[in-house]
């Protein structure tokens, strides 16, 4: 059995979810494929838990739940960049929150990992949206994998699906709902005739919306994901600044009621060909009319025609599903070497 070591950078919601799923699926999935996957380091902003033989996942999750990571026996003062460089590992999971203005600290983490000969899997949208060509080019130069399925659509396997099964197609357009928070709010407003603020407050109480929901409400999150899809699937060379973005702040109960009378709903839609994110009228019987936190993404292709993917676009377990799918993809390539 081949031993493979991971470094987890960023131990927030996605990091914890990834370790929970890894613990759950290790024996059933990974070991059956011939891999003993160990976590060699878990890096947080002020230090790291490091054990070259493999960290006990239960102990790390328990320490995190009680806010006592620093009391873990394997705690070190090594910051993430240092840990990426010195810890013996095969794959770095870059799971930190993204800053769309700078892309940091994700860009530095990804570059350091690739420069040190480590494959990378990331859920961090900002580096992939801002430095797609640079980072994928560096990975190719180093003969390494950079995987980022978890940056778009939660558990929806859109990037890997295209790469593994649909690459014979020319994708003519990508169009869809890419943000579960805004979709939940619009669904709530439409179905229960409540204001945006009322729907937003409930979303925050349920943990669907962040305390500062601006990235979701103003369309930034959708635009970032749109850029990633455009570059990775359609071969475009665009950045966030190329997208015209308008969010849902001005949507009222009156506008939704008017749409309803004419057989429409209003959804926040990302449109690659239009280079735009904006609220749009969608017929009630249209495939994009999905409710709650669901995402729906339509690909129009020259051979396969139109394909619509629907699924949960957020959540720690759903995103962890995509993170570990990318890990397994890398493991399969390592197995063939």
Give names to the regions the model predicted.
Residues 9, 13, 17, 37, ...:
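Conserved active-site and cofactor/substrate-binding residues in soluble primary-metabolism enzymes
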Residues 200-294:
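Substrate-binding/catalytic subdomain of NAD(P)-dependent oxidoreductase enzymes
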Residues 91-94, 121-123, 146-150, 173-176, ...:
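General beta-strand structural signal in soluble alpha/beta enzymes
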Residues 286-337:
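ATP-dependent carboxylate/acyl-activation modules
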Residues 98-115, 123-163:
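Rossmann-fold NAD(P)-binding glycine/threonine-rich loop
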Residues 163-224, 229:
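Conserved anion/nucleotide-ligand pocket segment
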């Amino acid at each position: 059995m081949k031993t493979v070591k991971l470094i987890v950078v960023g131990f927030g919601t996605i990091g914890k979810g990834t370790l929970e799923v890894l613990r759950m699926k290790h024996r059933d999935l990974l070991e059956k494929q011939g891999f003993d996957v160990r976590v060699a380091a878990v890096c947080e902003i002020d230090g790291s838990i490091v054990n070259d033989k493999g960290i006990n996942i239960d102990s790390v999750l328990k320490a995190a739940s009680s806010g006592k990571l620093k009391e873990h026996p394997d705690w070190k003062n090594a910051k993430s960049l240092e840990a990426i460089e010195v810890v013996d590992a095969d794959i770095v999971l870059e799971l930190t929150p993204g800053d769309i203005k700078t892309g940091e600290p994700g860009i530095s983490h990804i570059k350091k990992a690739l420069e040190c000969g480590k494959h990378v899997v990331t859920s961090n949208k900002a580096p992939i949206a801002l430095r797609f060509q640079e980072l994928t080019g560096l990975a190719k130069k180093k003969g390494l994998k950079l995987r980022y399925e978890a940056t778009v659509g939660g558990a929806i396997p859109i990037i890997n699906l295209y790469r593994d099964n649909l690459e014979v197609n020319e994708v003519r357009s990508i169009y869809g709902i890419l943000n579960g928070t805004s979709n939940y709010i619009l669904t709530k407003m439409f179905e229960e005739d409540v204001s945006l603020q009322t729907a937003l407050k409930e979303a925050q109480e349920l943990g669907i919306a962040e305390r500062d929901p601006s990235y979701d409400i103003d369309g930034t999150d959708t635009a970032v994901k749109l850029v990633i899809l455009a570059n990775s699937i359609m071969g475009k060379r665009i950045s966030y600044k190329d997208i015209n973005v308008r969010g849902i702040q001005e949507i009222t109960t009156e506008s939704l009621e008017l749409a309803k009378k004419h057989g429409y709903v209003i959804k926040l839609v990302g449109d690659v060909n239009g280079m735009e994110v904006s609220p749009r009228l969608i017929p009630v019987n249209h495939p994009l009319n999905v409710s709650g936190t669901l995402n729906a993404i339509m690909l129009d292709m020259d051979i396969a025609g139109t394909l619509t993917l629907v699924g949960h676009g957020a959540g720690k377990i759903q995103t962890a599903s995509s993170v570990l799918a990318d890990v397994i993809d890398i493991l399969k390539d390592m197995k063939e070497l």
